[in-house]
A protein has these predicted regions:
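Short, conserved micro-motifs enriched in small and acidic residues
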Residues: 74-83
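Non-catalytic linker/capping segments at the edges of enzyme domains
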Residues: 1-74
Length: 161
């Protein structure tokens, strides 16, 4: 399976239950993936390991609220960027308290199509490799038909212990 082959919404929902951020989160109030955010406050995207995919392949469902959209019903670009951010980080983050967390160093996004609010999407992230404390990852946002509507690449740096 290629990295841009999406999982089903049901698989993303199942993966989300394995989100390591529920056990340990360096930024629990993160706008995108913070488990201490209430429904309607932040994006609440919880990317967890996908069964049957290589380690570091995560997925989560996302249904953007209408408050995240403009008058045209389309989710604002900065919010789409945010939806793709944390799924790249959780390709490498663990619940192990002895492992220092990672922080985002570089991020590039391409939005391929409008992202209407109040629809179901699957967000996926996967590892592209490591170089010392550097971790490269990618992510994509898929619509209900499995079409890629946005994609990103990211460089994460692990903090020193």
């Amino acid at each position: 399976m290629g990295p841009f082959e999406p999982v089903t919404l049901a698989s993303a929902e199942a993966a989300s239950t394995r989100y390591v951020g529920f056990e340990r989160h360096p930024f629990p109030r993160c706008f995108t993936c913070g488990p201490e955010r209430d429904a309607g406050d932040g994006l609440r995207i919880f990317p967890g390991q996908v069964e049957g995919r290589p380690d570091g392949t995560v997925a989560a469902p996302w249904r953007p609220h209408s408050t995240l959209a403009g008058p045209d019903g389309v989710v604002a670009a900065p919010v789409v960027w945010a939806s793709l951010d944390c799924p790249t980080g959780f390709t490498v983050m663990t619940a192990d308290a002895d492992v220092p967390p990672y922080v985002l160093a570089r991020f590039a996004v391409r939005i391929d199509a409008p992202v209407p609010a109040d629809r179901d999407y699957v967000v996926m992230g996967w590892s592209l490799g490591d170089d010392g404390r550097k971790h490269l990852a990618a992510s994509a946002l898929f619509d209900e038909q499995g079409v890629t509507v946005a994609r990103a690449s990211a460089l994460w740096i692990q903090l020193r212990a």
